[in-house]
Design a protein with these regions (language model features):
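ATP-binding N-terminal substructure of ATP-dependent carboxylate-amine bond-forming enzymes
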Residues: 1-120, 124-125, 129-131, 135, ...
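ATP-dependent carboxylate activation and anion-phosphoryl transfer catalytic cores
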Residues: 2, 8-11, 144, 275-377
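Active-site nucleotide/adenylate-binding loops and adjacent lid/helix of ATP-dependent enzymes
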Residues: 2-8, 12-13, 19-23, 84-88, ...
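A short glycine-rich, hydrophobically flanked beta-strand micro-motif that places a catalytic Asp/Glu
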Residues: 37-39, 212-216, 224-225, 296-310
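Phosphate-binding site of ATP-dependent enzymes
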Residues: 193-265, 275, 279, 313-314
Length: 377
């Protein structure tokens, strides 16, 4: 039976959302195939093995037995407790359920790579690019995928100066949208209708991140989402959903606080499958596959698109490399259960790990010997 490490929580503004995703993932494994090893990382960065992940109350109290404190060793073994009585668990595969910084941004993927643990999620490069909205936009432009007009800033003064300059050419008029570069779940995202709101949004946003993305705000648009993951037989694409928002963009409250259900994107009002033309469906699918392949992605990735009803143009908004609930609900009409998806992800992670293991990472040289000889002379 394979030991599956599920990492969640973490030092991130999306800490609580991560817990909800982990609960859903852990509840969906085939217990006859896998031994699930849930590890909670608290807001101080401490790791704990969790015996009953379904109990949300314990996370509210944040009370965990020090005996369950654990550490991941370089050999891929999880050590629980201290001393001679510490428990050792050899990890076979890992699922990262950590949204936002210190998890979804590639940091955890990098750690698992160093410890030679196969993970089902995107690697360091694709994770870090997708997490940074500014880098992601630049990459999209480089591969020919359309994005909404934007500029980026690192200070309030720069934000005011850049806006004044952009306003002169008529491209950036209110309303505008301000987004922290590396946050998800719509945290810190503000629609600004005037200069005062804009300045305040920039001040608040720079308390959450060191750089901001400023976008032209569309006023007549629809949002469309599609998820993709890879298997040994090729890419699997979900049906397309159309989220329905009461505001100008889908807020954190609508995603996670609606009726207290806490199911994230699965809980929002939406049209599913989206009632769109075959041409638009094909365009969304084409771009989703292209981005997935160009960024060399792995695991489940949800792509969020925006369609401008006025200009009849489709734009990529963002890619979520660790989407809430692993976007399992988008595959239901494909007759793919969450359990089946998890099996697929593990199977592909195994193949991917073997392929990467065969890559030569080191080689012998005479550099040190020659350097040593030169010193002796």
């Amino acid at each position: 039976m394979k030991n599956i490490l599920v990492l969640f929580g973490g030092e991130t503004t999306e800490h609580d959302i991560s817990i909800l995703t982990a609960i859903q993932v852990c509840d969906s494994f085939d217990v006859l195939k896998y031994n699930v090893v849930p590890v909670y990382i608290n807001k101080n960065g401490e790791w704990f093995l969790v015996s009953d992940i379904g109990s949300v109350a314990r996370f509210l109290k944040s009370e965990f037995n020090i005996k369950n404190r654990c550490v991941l060793n370089y050999d891929g073994v999880l050590s629980v407790g201290k001393g001679l009585r510490s428990k050792k668990i050899t990890i076979d595969y890992a699922f990262i359920c950590m949204h936002g910084i210190n998890g979804e941004d590639g940091t955890m993927a990098g750690l698992l790579d160093l410890y030679h643990i196969p993970t089902v999620n995107c690697g360091v490069e694709s994770s870090s690019i997708a997490m940074n909205k500014i880098l992601f936009k630049k990459f999209m432009l480089a591969i020919g995928v359309p994005v909404i007009d934007y500029f980026d800033v690192r200070s309030v003064d720069e934000a005011i100066m850049r806006l004044n300059k952009k306003t002169k050419d008529g491209r950036f008029l209110f309303p505008l949208i301000v987004k922290p570069a590396r946050l998800g779940s719509s945290i810190g995202v503000v629609v600004c209708n005037n200069i005062d709101e804009y300045e305040k949004a920039c001040v608040d946003g720079l308390m959450l991140d060191d750089s901001l993305l400023i976008e032209r705000c569309l006023t007549n648009f629809n949002e469309y989402n599609m998820a993709v993951y890879n298997t040994e037989d090729g890419l699997v694409v979900s049906d397309i959903e159309q989220p329905l928002s009461l505001s100008k963009f889908l807020s954190f409250e609508e995603k996670y606080l609606n009726d207290g259900k806490g199911d994230g994107m699965e809980n929002i009002s939406r049209v599913f499958p989206a009632k769109i033309s075959k041409n638009l469906q094909s365009e969304i699918t084409l771009y989703a596959k292209k981005i997935y392949q160009e960024l060399n992605m792995k695991g489940v990735v949800r792509f969020d698109f925006i369609y401008d009803n006025q200009d009849k143009k489709l734009y990529i908004n963002e890619a979520n490399t660790i989407p809430g609930s692993y976007s399992n609900y988008l595959f239901r009409n494909k007759q793919i259960s969450f359990t089946h998806m998890l099996d697929d992800l593990i199977a592909y992670a195994r193949v991917d790990y073997i392929n990467k293991k065969n890559i030569i990472k080191t080689f012998d040289t005479s550099v040190l010997k020659e350097y040593s000889n030169s010193i002796k002379k």
